[in-house]
A protein has these predicted regions:
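Hydrophobic core of alpha-helical transmembrane segments in multi-pass integral membrane proteins
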Residues: 1-13
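12-transmembrane solute porter fold
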Residues: 7, 20-190, 202-228
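Interfacial non-cytosolic loop connecting adjacent transmembrane helices
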Residues: 193-198
Length: 233
């Protein structure tokens, strides 16, 4: 993960001097709204993308639920996001996206912090509550943040801005899973989850969710740091 971040920074500086860059780095170095909105997106995906992976393991190996029941529980978050995102997108047309997206990131932080207390005895209802908080947080963050990114560039750079959103999403997902696999390998190694190492798995999950909540908190400040969004026509 650290090597990937280092190489990513080197890549950005190389692109800055390249004759035909893959990424228009002037948008990152000169456009505050564009840069911090993308940073917030990267942090958000890095902090949240491993949730489904971790909770699916928890529900099946700790709660002993089947794949179908586990999937239906986890589905709470994306369904809420899908239902609310169109509303929050329109909301960000009337309220500054910085405020809406930052509130969403704060809710994601809260949801992750709730999950950091995961125990074998944690009720499914409490888990659903955390997923509801996360679902609302995702909805408040995602559409307004994308709105801020797309609105911060001129028409000629809309394709670049859209590609950057996708890049931040995929990079964040890879980082999130990389961190999760690293921590799990430290706590339980290559062993399958079984009664003898369930407590180690729970400990690893708590460490991960607490770390992700701290990362998400940094994302709140990154989101606020974008400043007022001056939409470019």
């Amino acid at each position: 993960v650290a090597a990937g971040m280092f190489l990513g920074i080197l890549f950005l500086f190389y692109e800055k001097t390249a004759r035909s860059p893959l990424i228009e780095t002037s948008l990152l170095f000169r456009n505050r709204t564009f840069a911090f909105s993308n940073l917030a997106a990267l942090i958000n995906y890095s902090a949240t993308s491993a949730i489904v992976f971790l909770l699916s393991l928890y529900l099946q190996y700790i709660k002993h639920l089947g794949p179908r029941e586990s999937g239906l529980i986890i589905l709470t978050q994306p369904v809420l996001m899908a239902l609310l995102s169109p509303i929050t997108g329109r909301l960000s047309d009337h309220i500054e996206p910085r405020i809406v997206a930052s509130a969403g990131m704060a809710l994601c932080t809260t949801g992750l912090f709730i999950l950091s207390g995961l125990q074998a005895e944690t009720s499914v209802e409490w888990l659903l509550f955390a997923l509801v908080v996360l679902g609302i947080g995702f909805a408040l963050f995602s559409s307004p943040n994308t709105n801020a990114i797309m609105g911060s560039v001129s028409r000629e750079y809309l394709g670049v801005a859209s590609a950057m959103v996708g890049t931040m999403r995929l990079t964040g997902q890879m980082m999130s899973m990389g961190i999760a696999m690293l921590v799990l390998s430290v706590f339980i190694g290559k062993n399958p989850i079984n009664p003898s190492n369930q407590e180690a798995f729970l400990h690893a999950s708590r460490v991960l969710f607490l770390s992700f909540s701290a990362l998400s908190l940094l994302g709140v400040f990154a989101s606020l740091a974008r400043g007022r969004n001056n939409t470019i026509k």
